[in-house]
Amino acid sequence: MKFIIVLILISVLIATIVPVNEAQTQCQSVRDCQQYCLTPDRCSYGTCYCKTTGK
């Protein structure tokens, strides 16, 4: 019984930590996108968009 409780606690802990790490990789401004692409275009709804060449 204790083993099941420990497994539940570990799974809850993992479920709360993983989204926090993902949120840190999302952008708040265009400056945050510079680590993902050389020419950042914009940050929209937490997603980085890079400028593309017309070639």
Curated annotation (Swiss-Prot):
Subcellular compartments: Secreted
Disulfide bonds: C27-C43, C33-C48, C37-C50
Residues with Pyrrolidone carboxylic acid modification: Q24
Record keywords, A-Z: Amidation, Disulfide bond, Ion channel impairing toxin, Neurotoxin, Potassium channel impairing toxin, Pyrrolidone carboxylic acid, Secreted, Signal, Toxin
Tissue: Expressed by the venom gland.
Main location: secreted
Keyword Secreted found: yes
Residues where Threonine amide is found: T53
GO molecular function: potassium channel regulator activity; toxin activity
Coiled coil spans: none
Annotated GO CC locations: extracellular region
Comment on protein domains: Has the structural arrangement of an alpha-helix connected to a beta-sheet by disulfide bonds (CSalpha/beta).
Record family assignment: Belongs to the short scorpion toxin superfamily. Potassium channel inhibitor family. Alpha-KTx 17 subfamily.
Function text: Blocker of potassium channels, which inhibits both the delayed rectifier and fast transient potassium current. The inhibition is reversible and voltage-independent. It causes a depolarizing shift of the steady-state activation curve of the currents, without changing their steady-state inactivation behavior.
Name this polypeptide is given: Potassium channel toxin alpha-KTx 17.1
